[in-house]
Amino acid sequence: MGMAWIVLLLGAGAIIYNHVYRKRMYREIDRLEEWKINLMNRPVPDELAKVKQLNMTGETEQLFERWRQQWDDIVAVKLPNVEEQLFDAERLLDKYRYRQARRLLGQIADGLRRLEEEVHEIIHEVNELIGSEEQSRAEIEELRAAHREAKKALLAYRYTFGSAADLLDVRLTEAEKQFQRFAELTEAGNYLAARDVVLTLKEELGRLTAMMEEIPKLLGECQTSLPAQLAELADGYREMEERGYILDHLHMERTLQEKREKIEQCLAMIHELRIEEAKQIVAELKEEIDALYDLLENEVLAHQYVQTEMPRLSGMLQELAAEAKETEAEALFVQQSYHLAPSDLEKYRSIEKQLHQLQKRFFLIQDRVAEAKTAYSLLKEELEQLVSQIDLMKEEHEQFRTMLQTLRKDELIAREKLDGMRKTLAEALRLVQKSRLPGLPEPYALELAEARRSLQAVAARLEEKPLDMPAVDQALEEAKAAVERLYERTVEMIEQATLAERTIQYGNRYRRRYPAVRKGLEEAEFLFRHYDYEEALRQAVAAVEEVEPGAFDRVQKLWQEDNSREQ
């Protein structure tokens, strides 16, 4: 029974699928039929009718015939073939030959797609032909007007174009022939070729118009402005030489001649209508001439700089030499009281050597200025280097003088530090005396002796002649560590002794009742009398905490309260 239901369901499913699939295939046939009808109704005949309004000769006639034949072939042959294929597809569906029907429908769709492209191309080409004719007709009149204006300008202002006028005349005459060529092609129905003539003519007239705008300006530059600037440079150069400027390194006469030759090249380019090249040459010439002006101006500025800086540098070097002598005397005096490191002495000798070299260089420059055989720009460069080196040497000299002055300051600071550490040591001893300890532990006594020895070492270093400040600083560091360590140990020892004593006193209340407490406290007292305060505190705390946990915390709290009241 179950198997029968399965067979029944499968059969029903197959019937439903077959029905749905056939329906889908028929919808595809309807879609392709509609596409075919749409293609047949395209307005190709109307578009071709527009072509008949043109001159039906030459190229236009050939194109029209080709488009008409293409359209006739589509309507009379290709679309009827599509119709037959659609009928074939329907017959295949009726016979349930779905695979063959699907393949045929795919072929029909591909064919319609190709026909769609062919129809689109016909319409596009027709519109292009008609559009080019309309556009060319409008543009040719604009070009005629532009050509007339150019001819008129050339005639009226011929002198402003120089030798280029003849070639411009030739080019405009050649352009005029293109108008006749356009008319002939249009008359012959060759509208696309006529369109090419319009585009070529438009480009040529654009170039000629641009040239006619640029040529007068370029001729003005090459015939008037640039030669005048070169003449001005030549006059300025001669005048500066007469005033004593050394300008041989500029090679001005040769350079000016090169610029004149470049101007001649530019004029030849203008004559040949190589306008873009001529514009580039003129731009380069302007930059190069500006650079020549800058060179002459730099010489004038350099002359002013040399005249101003020479006296100033002379005074600077004299002042520096005087300061160096003072520093030398100061260094000799300081050496009697302080030890100078070899590097410091070498630095001073280097400063002296640099000063002599700078003075020598200055005198050489001074001689060259007097000889008047060196360009001021070169002298300026040397003086700028000299100024930079003088500033550097002044900085090094000032650092050395500061170091000498610092030595005395460092000594005073070292003595102040020594006094401070002595006070710290005295304060530690005062605390010990105030605490009335029965005695001092041996480790503490050794630390105390070490602190005193370190302070004596610093004092001895400060009495040495010459004074070696690095050695003093080293001794100070060692003394500082020893004194600080002793002071901390003092505070710790007094605290341990006081707490040990108070803990023993607190534990006395349990001494009679608890033999163990009595024994622990007696041992703590023994350690206290033998100056072992740390161990005495540990022993006393252990004994008391045995019978009263937290007792040491209460002892500490009471001691801290007493300290607060005393302070």
Swiss-Prot record:
Which parts pass through the membrane? 3-21
Per UniProt, subcellular location reads as: Cell membrane
- InterPro entries, sorted: EzrA
Parts forming coiled coils: 98-159, 251-497
Mind naming one GO cellular-component term on file for this protein? septin ring
* Location (main, coarse): membrane
**What are the entry keywords?**
Cell cycle, Cell division, Cell membrane, Coiled coil, Membrane, Septation, Transmembrane, Transmembrane helix
The stretches that face the Extracellular side, renumbered to this chain, are: 1-2
Q: Does the keyword Cell membrane apply?
A: yes
Q: What is this entry's stated membrane topology?
A: Single-pass membrane protein
Q: Which GO terms describe its biological process?
A: division septum assembly; septin ring assembly
For the Cytoplasmic compartment, the record's topological domain ranges are 22-567
HAMAP family on file: EzrA (MF_00728)
State the protein's purpose. Negative regulator of FtsZ ring formation; modulates the frequency and position of FtsZ ring formation. Inhibits FtsZ ring formation at polar sites. Interacts either with FtsZ or with one of its binding partners to promote depolymerization.
So what family is this one in? Belongs to the EzrA family.
Q: What is this protein called?
A: Septation ring formation regulator EzrA
Task: Supply the source organism's classification.
Answer: Bacteria, Bacillati, Bacillota, Bacilli, Bacillales
